[in-house]
Amino acid sequence: MAVFLLLLALGLLLAKPSESRMKGTTEQFSQEEMQPAAKQTLEESANSTLSDKNTGLSISKHVMSATPLTPRRLSFIIPKGNTMRDGRNCVNSLRVWRTEVDGNASCQLGNDFIHGSMDVSLRIPKATRGKCEQTPKPSSSGSLGLERTTCKVLAGHQCLRSHEHSITSLKKILTVLASNSLMSWLVSGCKL
């Protein structure tokens, strides 16, 4: 029984997020999804649980204009705690990105949120320009902070999606508990 409790405590310590590294969001633009139409707004919200003040969100944007020889890449880091005012200006070091894409080109946004082994992938058709903003929100549990990153992209057709992504270590804890129970059962079986 003592071995089981030690293994359980060790498993809980390992499953606890240690200075979790935030997600990288990569947005790529492809050719076939763009159709010229009235500009619409696409809003994607990602809620993510952060446990450390040094954690940041890294976003890089690849833009391919109508001519394939002139790719542009814009990237920035959003440290935790930075906020935006009115969706235009940023406090501290955050920069708002806006990218104009020709009517011939198209955009395909692929967002990959990675936390440990968990991946969430979104495919959002085409965009002609966009901006990102981040608003920190306190959560009910003391040490964990909840931040919301909102990306608005003007697109050729309307596609409104809201995706909230909150990461917990419940899956890891259940895995550790199951493996510890199995190990405890095997150890008790060997003693017989």
From Swiss-Prot:
Signal peptide: 1-15
Keywords associated with the record: Glycoprotein, Secreted, Signal
The keyword Chloroplast belongs to this UniProt entry's keyword annotation: no
Record-level Gene Ontology MF annotations: nucleic acid binding
Main location: secreted
Biased composition (Polar residues): 43-54
Region annotation Disordered: where it falls in the sequence: 21-54
Single GO cellular component term: extracellular region
Glycosylated sites: 47, 104
UniProt-listed InterPro entries: RNaseA (IPR001427)
Compartments reported by the entry: Secreted
Domain of life the protein comes from: Eukaryota
PANTHER family: RIBONUCLEASE, RIBONUCLEASE 11-RELATED
Family per similarity comment: Belongs to the pancreatic ribonuclease family.
Listed name of the protein: Putative inactive ribonuclease 11
